[in-house]
Amino acid sequence: MKIDRIELYHVAIPLPGPFYPAWIPGYPQTVNRFTLLRLTTDDGVQGLAAGVAFENEREGLGGLIGPYLIGMDPTDIPLIHQRLREVSYLGWRNFWIEAACWDIRGKVEGKPVWALLGGREGGRAEVYASTGEVHPPEQRAEEVLRLREMGFRTVKLRVHSFDPAEDIAQVAAVRRAVGDSMALGVDANQGWRVALIDDAPLWDLDRALHFAGACADHDVGWIEEPLDMYAYDELAELASRSKVPIAGGELNGGWQEFKVMLEKGSYDIYQPDATMGGGITDTLKVLKACGERGLAYTPHT
């Protein structure tokens, strides 16, 4: 079995109204975009994978790395992973393509991918509601109460204000509103510092420590991406001094970056993304390493 054809589709789903993501200040998002990949083998088996859009760069992806993949056995995941890592210098990290090969392997063996990975049937995982925009404290509290009515028992808040007191006020307002009926997490979105405005609220270690102290007073379960994703040493100091678990890693790419973070103790909770963080192969390495160290692992999606 060999890869015979690579096809890319740029998907754009209009949103009902402008959405202002906390992770890109100043950006009014009106369309949800992603790139869909379809691999077809010489036997006619197809595998699908989806990654972030970047249409202009993806446009030439097939011609750029196609020659590196065409003719390869898609079920030889280790070799596919190695090839994707080798060609990463040609453009954006394309580890997300690996998922299509897992899809093909699952179809060939007649098993879902979770079974190929050693998962067990019948398990349950509680989901949490994740807010996406930064809203004033009282508005956020009302939104969280509605989420509780929908059945959610955990919610993740977004804090990305210029005034640190405003971020703390949001957490306090939500905790007052829900009491102890919900668990709270907070995402500062400091890992990826992209903005479409001249200025953006960027955190340093002092601000992160101050915020972590306030979160401890309001029984927050975790603080996500409180510093730049490459600030390994500062993150390690924060994790060692904070009473609230520090989480992150969704934007880091490849096992080598996670290996450094694990050695330094940058996080209490590791959140690799299989489409960006080295594919399923490397995220499994992170899972194993977290298990050996007694650390939490919650993959980003």
Where are these regions (language model features)?
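Structured beta-strand/loop patches that form or line metal/cofactor-binding pockets in enzymes
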Residues: M1-Q46
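Conserved, mostly hydrophobic/aromatic
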Residues: I3, G44, I65, I97, ...
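Metal- or metallocofactor-binding catalytic centers and their adjacent structured scaffolds
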Residues: R5, T40-V108
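Anionic group-transfer/hydrolysis microenvironments
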Residues: T40, V52, A100, R158, ...
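Shared catalytic-loop signature of beta/alpha-barrel
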Residues: E59, P67, G213, D219, ...
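Glycine-rich, aromatic-flanked loop segments that form ligand/cofactor-binding clefts
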Residues: W96-V134, S181
